[in-house]
């Protein structure tokens, strides 16, 4: 589903931060200011958003993995929901340093979480003392909260999608270090540097955040559907080809 300028306006994507907090590197994307608030130029945002979604579609069509990152209160819920709908990993609690650059260690924690889930399923809690069971549950809840969204991520992702690049500076730095492309919502108070696909826009309004996140999830599902369609059509084309024997 394509997003329109009207939808962006209605979601308040154009409202930036107070002018005194601005980052001059965002000047090319700023339309002006009203009541000491910077107004983002949506005529720049819309094509840049579309460009990012085109990249997301292509990546999804090639079975790529996109890690959704949004740990702020107003983005957590919708981000986890939409990443789940698109079948992609996500980080909605705190970003743990080394989540990308030290994925080996993170993998150990993922294995621990999966083992604990399997043990619980097999009824291991019934053989534990009350105290042991409580400690077990606590550890499992803690692990689920911090890495539950990435437990099916087999390795580092092919790209990351970040809502508020300043708030998630560590995630962006880790991705840059590993050469992982970054799709990022950048507000007027942050720098677009290090972001491969910049989406200049409001990163605080829950309506605006929902618009970006749904857009990315839709693009992933479209990319996958297009890839399946191409395979079906290619197979159909092969069936229709009949070799004629000569003589």
Swiss-Prot record:
The keyword Signal does not apply. GO terms for biological process: translation. The keyword Ribonucleoprotein applies. Keywords: Ribonucleoprotein, Ribosomal protein. GO terms for cellular component: cytosolic small ribosomal subunit. GO terms for molecular function: structural constituent of ribosome. Belongs to the universal ribosomal protein uS2 family. PANTHER family: 30S RIBOSOMAL PROTEIN S2 PROKARYOTIC AND ORGANELLAR (PTHR12534), SMALL RIBOSOMAL SUBUNIT PROTEIN US2M (PTHR12534:SF0). This is Small ribosomal subunit protein uS2. The lineage of its organism: Bacteria, Pseudomonadati, Pseudomonadota, Betaproteobacteria, Burkholderiales. The gene is rpsB.
């Amino acid at each position: 589903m394509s997003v329109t300028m009207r939808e962006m306006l209605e979601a308040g994507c154009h409202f930036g931060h107070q002018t005194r907090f601005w980052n001059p590197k965002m000047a090319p994307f700023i339309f002006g200011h009203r009541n000491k608030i910077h107004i983002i130029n949506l005529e720049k945002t819309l094509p840049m958003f579309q460009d990012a979604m085109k990249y997301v579609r292509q990546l999804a069509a090639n079975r790529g993995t996109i890690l959704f990152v949004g740990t702020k209160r107003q983005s957590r819920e919708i981000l986890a929901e939409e990443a789940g709908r698109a079948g992609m990993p996500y980080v909605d609690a705190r970003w743990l340093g080394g989540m990308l650059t030290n994925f080996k260690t993170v993998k150990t924690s993922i294995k621990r979480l999966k083992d604990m889930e399997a043990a619980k399923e097999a009824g291991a809690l019934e053989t534990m003392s009350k105290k042991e069971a409580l400690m077990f549950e606590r550890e499992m809840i803690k692990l689920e909260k911090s890495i539950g969204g990435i437990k099916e991520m087999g390795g580092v992702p092919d790209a990351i999608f970040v809502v508020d690049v300043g708030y998630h500076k560590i995630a962006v730095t880790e991705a840059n270090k590993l050469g992982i492309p970054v799709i990022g919502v950048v507000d007027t108070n942050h720098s677009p540097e290090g972001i491969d696909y910049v989406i200049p826009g409001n990163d605080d309004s829950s309506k605006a955040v929902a618009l970006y996140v749904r857009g990315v999830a839709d693009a992933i599902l479209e990319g996958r559907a297009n890839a399946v369609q191409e395979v079906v059509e290619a197979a159909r084309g092969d069936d229709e080809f009949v070799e004629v024997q000569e003589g």
